[in-house]
């Protein structure tokens, strides 16, 4: 899901309740993926990128774009969901030639990157005619937090959600905090430190 894996670990003395909570959480994650994935041609986000305007968007899509624009304003554009043409350019060039794209090509694509051209209204989202957006920098975290809400609604208090290495802990395990090993980037068979999680994320 979302071009990565999700695992949910739950501690509960009620297996049926835990099973229902996990199933509902995964269903919500799948629903979010069907709306926000840039890899699914039938997703709402893909339709927005094709048509440049989307009427009656889902709340998940609207919330994520609004949140992304908030962070774009906060960072003065350092975080920008309209960066997709640049990501696509680098991906294609490395795939075809094994080298970074040429400077002039990058400059041309950079003209499409401007979060201020994204318009969000109550029942409509519009992007520039030459723009493409990606929610890869925000959607996975949103999906995790939505899964946390569902687990809590089932009175689950001890859980760990692993979203492709992004870890979100709910409370602690019966034996204590969740100990998360941070992989050594130079040696995948080793780790560089252990991070204890207690109702937080890394």
Stretch-by-stretch model annotation:
Residues 1-202:
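Mature catalytic core of soluble alpha/beta enzymes
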């Amino acid at each position: 899901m979302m071009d990565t894996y999700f695992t949910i670990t739950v501690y509960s003395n009620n297996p049926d309740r835990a099973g229902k909570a996990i199933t509902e959480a995964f269903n919500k994650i799948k629903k979010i993926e069907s709306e926000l994935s840039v890899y699914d041609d039938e997703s709402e986000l893909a339709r927005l990128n094709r048509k440049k305007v989307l009427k009656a968007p889902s709340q998940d899509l609207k919330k994520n774009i609004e949140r992304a624009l908030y962070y774009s304003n906060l960072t003065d554009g350092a975080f920008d969901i309209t960066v997709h043409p640049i990501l696509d350019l680098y991906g294609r060039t490395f795939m075809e030639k094994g080298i970074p794209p040429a400077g002039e090509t990058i400059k041309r694509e950079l003209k499409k990157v401007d979060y201020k051209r994204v318009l969000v209204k109550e029942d409509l989202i519009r992007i520039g005619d030459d723009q493409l957006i990606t929610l890869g920098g925000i959607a996975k975290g949103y999906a995790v937090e939505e899964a946390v809400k569902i687990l809590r609604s089932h009175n689950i208090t001890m859980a760990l959600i692993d979203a492709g290495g992004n870890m979100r802990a709910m409370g602690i395990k019966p034996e204590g905090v969740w100990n998360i090993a941070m992989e050594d980037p130079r040696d995948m068979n080793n780790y560089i430190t252990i991070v204890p999680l207690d109702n937080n994320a890394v």
